[in-house]
Swiss-Prot record:
It catalyses: L-glutamyl-tRNA(Gln) + L-glutamine + ATP + H2O = L-glutaminyl-tRNA(Gln) + L-glutamate + ADP + phosphate + H(+); L-aspartyl-tRNA(Asn) + L-glutamine + ATP + H2O = L-asparaginyl-tRNA(Asn) + L-glutamate + ADP + phosphate + 2 H(+). Its EC number is 6.3.5.-. Heterotrimer of A, B and C subunits. Belongs to the GatB/GatE family. GatB subfamily. Allows the formation of correctly charged Asn-tRNA(Asn) or Gln-tRNA(Gln) through the transamidation of misacylated Asp-tRNA(Asn) or Glu-tRNA(Gln) in organisms which lack either or both of asparaginyl-tRNA or glutaminyl-tRNA synthetases. The reaction takes place in the presence of glutamine and ATP through an activated phospho-Asp-tRNA(Asn) or phospho-Glu-tRNA(Gln). SMART domains: GatB_Yqey. This is Aspartyl/glutamyl-tRNA(Asn/Gln) amidotransferase subunit B. The gene is gatB. It comes from the Bacteria. PANTHER family: GLUTAMYL-TRNA GLN AMIDOTRANSFERASE SUBUNIT B MITOCHONDRIAL AND PROKARYOTIC PET112-RELATED, GLUTAMYL-TRNA(GLN) AMIDOTRANSFERASE SUBUNIT B, MITOCHONDRIAL.
């Protein structure tokens, strides 16, 4: 394992940005949502039993030959176009040579000096609404590696493990690696810029439909390169690469930590080691991994078993026409249509609820009601289950139906939550649940009047207070009636009946 600089006390962040200019470089690996692998016909299903989605090609057995997945090339071109890149008229695959157990061929088929897309940019919106442009150096295609599973250690890492197992299901899955040019000028906002960039890129890729971008499952993996140079200097410092940061929040935390750590090393007279570093989610720190290789170490050469990729101008223009409205422009348009604040819109986006709310509105629900259900109640249900919001077993159409049941006073808002819970439990459509469970609102005034009289008779002191003009005391009676009707009454109507009975 590479040895890093001695542990030192972290420098205060304000001192870091006063003395040093951070330089970032973001490398994002994206697994494409294709049915089969990059160079063979094996499926790409996540979570399959280990080593059940393999063949001679992705295992690198002698005599096997790769065939390019056209859908992966199409996705790569669309990503490049969405990132404002130039699409190469002549792209070539190359062999990246290195030995590691999760790489069965001892080389990875990637792209080197002739990538599919180059020289683009992505404008990202920061927390205060300002826009920061991140320049893209390249986007290139490659195949993913297998997965090492380290057994017997406390951390799940190789250090301390008794042995390692290898799962080659992931080997050969299509990847796009998107590499930025050095990101300068962010100053103290560098960690925020890093997080905002990955967020914007994730949203863009999802809108394109090329990946599910689930960081927790590894379909979007981020490496953050960080270096520091003294304020006013022009020569970049030595960089480190923090590998596989697997959440948006962690991207920001990892960059901030590495800036503080490097500044402390430099201030103590030490030197930064060019190395990879592991990010620890538990405490937000990084630790040394291995010395960082250079391109020469990989001994790239053209892949002899694959022809170059030469997309025609006509095909590129056809794909350009499929690029949807940018997510951030769409959000701004919808925010204006809804007339909500930046804060409300951030809550919607952070909850992953925007598309779900739009679909619920399209199904007939008012925007405010749709937003309330997805951002509040259903977000909590997703957290309880440990799933993403769009993985809950309820559709926008079903949420819209619940809203309509409340609007028509078939159920009240409290009972509506019970209806949603039954839908989440797989017990049927909302209206059918109301019918089967007897959850319809008690709307018969005579039945409600009887319950009001019972509650008043049981609480004569409160009845006297109401008659004396202390109408706020009616809340106790309303609560008793709601309890007696299992929450299935209209609380506003019950209150009217209570006040009328005491007048």
């Amino acid at each position: 394992m590479a040895m890093s600089a001695p542990t030192v006390e972290l420098m205060d962040y304000a001192d870091v940005v006063a003395r040093y200019e951070p330089v970032l470089g973001m490398e994002v690996h994206v697994e494409l949502s294709t049915a089969t692998k990059m160079f063979c016909g094996c499926p790409t299903d996540f979570g399959a039993e280990p080593n059940t989605q393999v063949c001679p090609v992705c295992l690198g057995l002698p005599g096997s030959l790769p065939v390019v997945n056209e859908k992966a090339v199409e996705s790569a071109i669309r990503i490049g176009l969405a990132l404002n890149c130039s699409i190469t008229p002549w792209g070539r695959f190359a062999r990246k040579n290195y030995f590691y157990p999760d790489q069965p061929k001892n080389y990875q088929i990637s792209q080197y000096d002739e990538p599919i897309a180059t020289d683009g940019h992505l404008d990202v919106v920061l927390d205060d609404g300002s826009v920061f442009r991140v320049d893209i150096e390249r986007a290139h295609m490659e195949e993913d590696t297998g997965k090492s599973v380290h057994v017997g250690g406390a951390t799940g890492r190789i250090h301390g493990a008794s042995h390692s197992l290898l799962d080659y299901n992931r080997a050969g899955v299509p990847l796009i690696e998107i590499v930025t040019k050095p990101i300068t000028g962010a100053g103290e906002r560098a960690p925020e810029v890093a997080r905002a960039y990955v967020t914007a890129l994730r949203d863009l890729l999802k809108s394109l439909g090329v990946s599910d971008v689930k960081m927790e499952q590894g379909s979007l993996r981020c490496d953050a390169n960080v270096s520091l140079m003294p304020v006013g200097a022009s020569e970049f410092g030595t960089r480190t690469e923090t590998k596989n940061v697997n959440s948006l929040k962690s991207v920001e935390v990892a960059v901030r930590y590495e800036m503080r750590r490097q500044a402390a090393v430099l201030a103590a007279g030490g030197a930064i080691v060019q190395e990879t570093r592991h990010f620890h989610e538990s405490d937000g720190t990084t630790s040394p991994g291995r010395r960082k290789e250079t391109a020469e170490d990989y001994r790239y050469f053209p892949e002899p078993d694959l022809e170059p990729i030469a997309p025609s101008p006509e095909w590129i223009e056809e794909l350009r026409a499929t690029i949807p409205e940018y997510p951030w422009l769409r959000r701004a348009r919808i925010q204006q249509e809804w007339g909500v604040s930046d804060e409300v819109m951030r809550d919607v986006v952070n909850a992953g609820a925007l598309d779900l709310i739009i679909a619920t509105v399209e199904a007939g629900a008012p925007a405010n009601e749709a937003r309330s259900w997805w951002v509040a109640y259903l977000s909590e249900k997703a957290k309880e289950r440990g799933v993403a919001l769009d993985e809950l077993p309820i559709t926008p159409a079903q949420v819209a139906e619940v809203v309509k049941l409340v609007e028509s006073k078939t159920v009240n808002s409290k009972v509506a939550k019970q209806v949603v819970d039954f839908v989440l439990a797989g017990e049927g459509e909302p209206a059918a649940v109301v019918e089967a469970k007897g959850l319809g609102m008690v709307s018969d005034d005579s039945a409600l009047q009887a319950e009001v009289e019972k509650a008043l008779a049981a609480n004569p002191d409160i009845a006297d207070k109401i008659r004396a003009g202390k109408v706020q005391a009616a809340g106790k009676i309303v609560g008793d009636v709601m309890k007696a009707t299992r929450g299935q009454a209209d609380a506003a109507r019950v209150r009217e009946l209570v006040l009328a009975a005491c007048s």
